[in-house]
Design a protein with these regions (language model features):
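Accessory RNA-recognition modules of RNA-modification enzymes
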Residues: 1-202
Length: 202
């Protein structure tokens, strides 16, 4: 780097290669009359349907499937980026790696969703489901979350523990998506810096 010969350091491999990611954002689309969710095709905004993503916990994909079933059952309008019409834009799911608590955030191009009691009851079947939040995003563009959040069920946040500290996590909170590797990163940095409980770190 910059002409310097740096000492090689060992790579700390992640303890898990599957099921580790604690956050997912699924864009929603409709094709042939049926709603589906997945991820954008590389370099495009074309949504590719995905039933199971192996880097996510099974509960996260289960939430996505429940929401899509609800959308199809009650014919909830799906957002169309080309016309800026429709309602549901994204399904956002966050799961505490330690607590197992799950936050579901639905991003909408409007003020609400129909038949919410039915959706909430269906989500209660998912172990760890804690809260349902609405994010209102009526702007054109690539931003997923909007500026307005409405709590529809539960406290509006989940809790989780990292490096012995407890955190409240909302849909807007920054939190490393690989919990186990983040903890190893912080612990390694503390050890290399020789930080003790008596030190004040700025």
């Amino acid at each position: 780097i910059s002409g310097e010969n740096l000492e090689e350091v060992p790579i700390l491999a992640a303890p898990a290669c599957e099921g580790y990611r604690n956050k997912a954002q699924y864009p929603v689309a409709r094709k042939n009359g049926k709603a589906y969710a997945g991820f954008f095709k590389e370099g495009t905004h074309e949504v590719v349907q995905m039933d199971r993503c192996r880097i996510l916990p099974e509960e996260t994909d289960r939430v996505k499937s429940i929401v899509i079933d609800y959308v199809n059952k009650y014919n909830v309008p799906v957002y169309d980026e080309s016309t800026h019409r429709g309602l549901l834009r994204h399904i956002y799911v966050r799961r505490g790696a330690v607590s197992g608590q799950i936050l579901v955030c639905l991003v909408v191009n409007g003020d609400g969703l129909p038949k919410l009691p039915a959706l909430i009851e269906a989500l209660k079947a998912v172990p760890g489901f804690t809260t349902l939040v609405l994010s209102v995003n009526t702007k054109k563009g690539n931003a997923v979350l909007g500026d307005k959040f409405v709590t529809l069920y539960g406290p509006g946040y989940i809790e989780d523990t990292l490096c012995g500290l407890n955190f409240r996590l909302s849909a807007r909170s920054f939190y490393q998506v690989n919990h186990a590797q983040a903890q190893r990163l912080y612990e390694t940095a503390i050890a290399m810096a020789g930080i003790t409980k008596k030190d004040l770190v700025l």
